[in-house]
Structure formats: structure tokens, C-alpha cells
């Protein structure tokens, strides 16, 4: 559909010429409908079109082609049938073009060099780069790391809202939630007690489900917690398939940071102490010997 080519009427020999014509036509169409960056038109499209190699389509198996078609190719959604503006080789060259927009010298030669790596499958960029390079939203990073502080503003803005925008453009999320006070922690502003991190992680989980990655795959996120946090046991239950669904996060992964001191205590069969993070504010930023010293001080 991207090439407007018929194997019976047009023959295999004409395939390269159809690629060249479709390449220029569909780049212009992508810019026209607001899917592609207009700076792509500044390239020497004739030179890039001559570099296209339709025989490299044979590098794909059926599953690879179908995945590319379903998730990665630029779609013209202004048409009734949601026509693809790309085939595999137009896809590779578009990604290559998007990665050299800021280059000033020998851009086309560099694009062709990168395209050659892509088409031969000797190299492949991450999914966000393949989704977004050359588009109006050229977010190319795969993953974002963040830390949530112990206040409602940080939790709701950094931990939920900002992550939604990052997930929207296919960014994976990994965040530290240790600083958020655990269950039973005193809240001075309301004279109440904290419900811990679990309800907020449930919000983050639902945000990953609600704001998927450009409509092409589900959101991806992982929450990290240190071993001394007093909500650790509830945290370790989050991925279970049974129990209260309000305290389960099926869309979000979890990870537990384990310090050397914990393993030393385990080996020696000694006690391990849990803390509410607001009561041990320095602990989260320490590691190694400094962590061990401060942890033991807090235990006293």
C-alpha cells in the first residue's frame, strides 16, 4: 500500500523505481499531515532514494514483517483505511534521516551509511527511536530514571503526571519510591498518618495502563524500594495475582535494592530493622560503608 505497486502488473524489476517514487511522495505526505518533520524535505531525496535496496526486505521473516507493519510504520490516519506511508526500506531510511537532522556536513552520506547497517540487521536502534525519529515528536530515549520525594506534590507531579507524558512517547520508566514515608508515618500538616506507598504505586500502575506508548504498546515502568523501608512486605506482594486488587500492580514491575549489610546480617542470622523513611532522612542517599554506619546509628 505504501508503494502503490502490483507484482503482476508492474514486475519485480520495477520495484526499486517504485521505492524511489514512493519515498519522495510519502515523505511529502507525512509532512503534509503533520506526522513527519518538515526538515526531512531539506535532504537530497533523489540521492537517498537511489540508495534504497528492496532486496533487503528478504532479511525479515513473516513475524518480523507483521510486527513492523502493526507497530512501527508511519500511518496516514486521515484516510479511511489508515494507509501505511512506509514499507521496510522506507522505514529504515526515515529513521536514519531523523537521526541526522542536526548534522551540517555530508548528511546524506552518513544517512546512507546508517541505513546500510539497519537494512542488513547489523545494528538496530531502540523502539522509541524507531517510533519517533523524523517525526514531530522526536523523543528517542528508551528509559527515564526519576526519584519521588516525600511530599504530595512530588508524588502526584513527578511520580504520576510527568511520567504520563514520558510514557506517551514510548519512554520506559524506572523510579525510586523509598523517600515516600511508609505506613503509619506522621503527617504534620493534617495531624494524620500516612497510608504508605502502596496506594500511590497503584495510581502509577493505572497511569501506565491508561497512557500507553503512542497507542503501539503498553506503558512500561518499574518502582524501586530499599530493603529497610517499612512497607517492604506489602511492596513484595504487589505483583501477586491474588489478594486485594487495590493493592496490586499488574502493569508495573517492582525491584528491591538490597545493600551488602542485609546480606551480612542474613548470613550471620542477625536481626534486620525497618524504618519509616521520614524518620531516617539521610539513609536513602547513602551507600557502602557510610550507609552501614548510619543504619547502625539509627538502630540505636
What spans do the regions from the language model cover?
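Extended catalytic cores of very large enzyme megasubunits
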Residues: 1-300
Amino acid at each position: 500500500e505504501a508503494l502503490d505497486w502490483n507484482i503482476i502488473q508492474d514486475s519485480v524489476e520495477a520495484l526499486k523505481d517504485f521505492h524511489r517514487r514512493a519515498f519522495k511522495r510519502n515523505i511529502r505526505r507525512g509532512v503534509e499531515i503533520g506526522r513527519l518533520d518538515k526538515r526531512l524535505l531539506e535532504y537530497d531525496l533523489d540521492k537517498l532514494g537511489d540508495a534504497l535496496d528492496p532486496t533487503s526486505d528478504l532479511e525479515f521473516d513473516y513475524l518480523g514483517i507483521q510486527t513492523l507493519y502493526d507497530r512501527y510504520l508511519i500511518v496516514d490516519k486521515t484516510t479511511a483505511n489508515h494507509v501505511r506511508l512506509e514499507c521496510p526500506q522506507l522505514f529504515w531510511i526515515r529513521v536514519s534521516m531523523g537521526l541526522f537532522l542536526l548534522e551540517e556536513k555530508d548528511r546524506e552520506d552518513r544517512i546512507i551509511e546508517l541505513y546500510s547497517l539497519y537494512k542488513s540487521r547489523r545494528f538496530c536502534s531502540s523502539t522509541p527511536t524507531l517510533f519517533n525519529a523524523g517525526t514531530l515528536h522526536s523523543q528517542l530515549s528508551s528509559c527515564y530514571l526519576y526519584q519521588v520525594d516525600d511530599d504530595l506534590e512530588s508524588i502526584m507531579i513527578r511520580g504520576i503526571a510527568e511520567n504520563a507524558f514520558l510514557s506517551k512517547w514510548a519512554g520506559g520508566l524506572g523510579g525510586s519510591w523509598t523517600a515516600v514515608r511508609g505506613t503509619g508515618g506522621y503527617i504534620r500538616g493534617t495531624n494524620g498518618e500516612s497510608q504508605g506507598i502502596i496506594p500511590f504505586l497503584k495510581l502509577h500502575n493505572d497511569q501506565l495502563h491508561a497512557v500507553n506508548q503512542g497507542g503501539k504498546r503498553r506503558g512500561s515502568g518499574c518502582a524501586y524500594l530499599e530493603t529497610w523501608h517499612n512497607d517492604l512486605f506489602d511492596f513484595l506482594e504487589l505483583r501477586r495475582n491474588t489478594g486485594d486488587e487495590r493493592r496490586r500492580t499488574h502493569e508495573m514491575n517492582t525491584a528491591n535494592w538490597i545493600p551488602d549489610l542485609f546480606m551480612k546480617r542474613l548470613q550471620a542470622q542477625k536481626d534486620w530493622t525497618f524504618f519509616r523513611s521520614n524518620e531516617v532522612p539521610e539513609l536513602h542517599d547513602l551507600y557502602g560503608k557510610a550507609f552501614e554506619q548510619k543504619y547502625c546509628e539509627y538502630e540505636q
